[in-house]
Amino acid sequence: MLLRLPPVFLTVLIAIASCSVYILNIAIESGFADSPYNFNQTTVGLAYMSTGIGYILSSMAGGRWMDSIMAREARKVVRSDSHGKLISLPEDHMKENAWVANTLYPLSSLWFGWTMYYGVQFMVPISALFVFGFTLMLHFTLGTTMLTEFVRKRSSAGVTVNNFVRNILSCVGTIVAAPWMKGVGLRYMMTKLCIICLLLGSLGIWLITRNAQRWRGTLDKALKEMD
């Protein structure tokens, strides 16, 4: 039922990023294990740490950045309650942070794919993985937080739907990654993945920011009918 509501569907659409995570994970393993890197299993495992460090740092800094953006947007239009507490709206989550995250995580996968193809010194693709992890966590955080704001009365259901779709996309990514990479090569796979993620993510962000005010009324009415 919730997926029929536009803001929920589009927030889940932005979660296409989940698919890219698992495609990249398989690309890391096969890429570093092959020539010219020829990493052993332990070293390949250590390569995943750069993405993990990006996740950790982003989870620490991303929330503060998003909070500052939301407070700025509320102050800009003097939106507060009778006690002077700032009131934020769901679309306040998607400002420059959304565009930065949605742009950099696909581009970092492109960076990774092409530097791996040309056998550039291993710290260069490793750096791409760090940027990917950092910006992807920003992407996940703002998407989940905004979704709970849209469906406050059913926030747990909204997050469940989001996770359900993410898991499906993760499964798809895991299944298609190896044959896709074998068919077109790492660089072209990452190029196509970059384009898909950029287009779908940008479309979702643009539609939400453009229509959020109108959709809030429709969403509140629909949620009341579900009660």
From Swiss-Prot:
Which biological process annotations from GO are given for this protein? intracellular polyamine homeostasis
Keyword annotations for this protein, in alphabetical order, are: Glycoprotein, Membrane, Transmembrane, Transmembrane helix, Transport
> Record's superkingdom?
Eukaryota
GO terms under cellular component: plasma membrane
Q: What is known about its induction?
A: Expression is induced in response to 2-benzoxasolinone (BOA) exposure.
Identify the InterPro entries for this entry: MFS_trans_sf
Query: Can you provide one Gene Ontology molecular function annotated for this UniProt record?
Result: polyamine transmembrane transporter activity
Q: What happens when the gene is disrupted?
A: Does not affect BOA degradation.
Q: Does the keyword Secreted apply?
A: no
> How does it sit in the bilayer?
Multi-pass membrane protein
Which residue ranges does UniProt annotate as crossing the membrane?
8-28, 43-63, 100-120, 122-142, 164-181, 188-208
**Where in the cell is the protein located?**
Membrane
What coarse category fits the chief subcellular location reported for this protein? membrane
Q: Which residues are glycosylated?
A: N40
- Family per UniProt? Belongs to the major facilitator superfamily.
Role of this protein = MFS-type transporter; part of the Fusarium detoxification of benzoxazolinone cluster 1 (FDB1) involved in the degradation of benzoxazolinones produced by the host plant. Maize, wheat, and rye produce the 2 benzoxazinone phytoanticipins 2,4-dihy-droxy-7-methoxy-1,4-benzoxazin-3-one (DIMBOA) and 2,4-dihydroxy-1,4-benzoxazin-3-one (DIBOA) that, due to their inherent instability once released, spontaneously degrade to the more stable corresponding benzoxazolinones, 6-methoxy-2-benzoxazolinone (MBOA) and 2-benzoxazolinone (BOA), respectively.
Q: What else is known?
A: Fusarium verticillioides possesses 2 unlinked loci, FDB1 and FDB2, necessary for detoxification of antimicrobial compounds produced by maize, including 2-benzoxazolinone (BOA). The FDB2 cluster arose as a duplication of the FDB1 cluster with rearrangement and expansion by incorporating additional genes.
The protein depicted here goes by the name: MFS-type transporter FVEG_08288
Q: Which organism is it from?
A: Gibberella moniliformis (strain M3125 / FGSC 7600)
